[in-house]
A protein has these predicted regions:
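Active-site acidic/histidine proton-transfer and metal-coordination neighborhood
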Residues: 1-117, 209, 236
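Conserved beta-strand positions in the central sheet of alpha/beta enzyme cores
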Residues: 31, 143-146, 225
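Flexible loop residues that form catalytic
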Residues: 35, 150, 229
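Acidic/histidine-rich catalytic cores of soluble enzymes
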Residues: 59-201, 254
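A short, acidic, amphipathic alpha-helical segment used as a generic capping/interface helix at domain edges
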Residues: 202-217
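A short, acidic, flexible beta-alpha connecting loop/helix-capping segment that sits on the rim
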Residues: 223-238
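C-terminal helical cap(s) of enzyme catalytic domains, especially alpha/beta-barrels
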Residues: 235-253
Length: 254
């Protein structure tokens, strides 16, 4: 949905291609985000409104949903239904769908049968959302799950969780992670308000037990995929922490 012609069309085609390829390979679930349009026709950059307390932001949101987001996702729903592939939306800030309410709105607007949620707790924690409650609330709309943790740091007491002290990474920087076109992943703030961490380093086994329990009520066979973005641990250390925590949590289910 990005208005940049070097970014939006390519990402949109990736989603369509993933659905088609999934059907050919017998893969029944593909994961993506919902995307974010500009705030008006002809806009050049995506625009995300945190709280539309001013009516101008409601105008922007109405355009983003009614003119761009809903038509696109109606088409994706039709393609997914034809292919019998479930499209799992990661509820991620800076997208149209970022919490249970926006997930439900999209599902209602497009009469979803093959578009639902990927339950990734990490993006919910820092918004103050309880992933267990969110899973129970969305129920059958949850198609897939990721295991990634978030730690809320002391700095959140000073700057809150809406901390914008990110830095720019040039596209030609050796550490740059391309997000399409000339876009890159921004540099994380020092003394950040929150961090993504390996499973178990933000929330203990008790939480993960209840999270697995809630997922099992939706679908006992649902895969829970470990996702590693902990900058303080290497990949094997992060995988070990996540696996040990999830195994301990699973052992408590009966």
């Amino acid at each position: 949905l990005d208005p940049n012609p070097e970014v939006g069309p390519r990402h949109a085609q990736d989603v369509r291609d993933a659905i088609e390829l999934g059907a050919l390979l017998g893969v029944k679930r593909v994961v993506t985000m919902s995307g974010l349009p500009a705030d008006e026709p002809g806009g050049r950059r995506p625009s995300w409104t945190v709280e539309p307390w001013h009516s101008v932001f409601l105008d922007a949101r109405d355009y983003q949903w009614n003119e761009v987001g809903i038509p696109f996702w109606k088409d994706i729903q039709a393609r997914a239904a034809d292919a019998d592939v479930k499209v799992c939306i990661e509820m991620h800030p800076h997208n149209l769908v970022y919490n249970p309410a926006t997930m439900e709105r999209l599902a209602t607007e497009i009469n979803a049968t093959h578009v639902g949620a990927e339950m990734d707790p990490s993006h919910l924690f820092w918004q103050g959302i309880d992933p267990v409650l969110a899973t129970e609330h969305l129920g059958g709309l949850v198609y897939n799950a990721a295991a990634k943790d978030t730690r809320i740091n002391e700095a959140a007491k000073l700057n809150g969780v809406l901390d914008d002290r990110f830095g720019r990474v040039a596209p030609d920087d050796p550490d740059a992670l391309s997000l399409g076109g000339s876009y890159t992943l921004s540099r994380w703030p020092e003394s950040s308000s929150w961090d993504f961490v390996a499973v178990g380093r933000g929330h203990d086994v008790d939480f993960w037990t209840e999270f697995l329990r809630a997922l099992a009520k939706v679908d006992p066979d649902m895969a829970v995929n470990i996702e590693h973005e902990d900058q303080e641990l290497d990949q094997l250390e992060g995988l070990r922490s996540a696996a040990e925590t999830l195994k301990a949590a699973a052992s408590r289910l009966g």
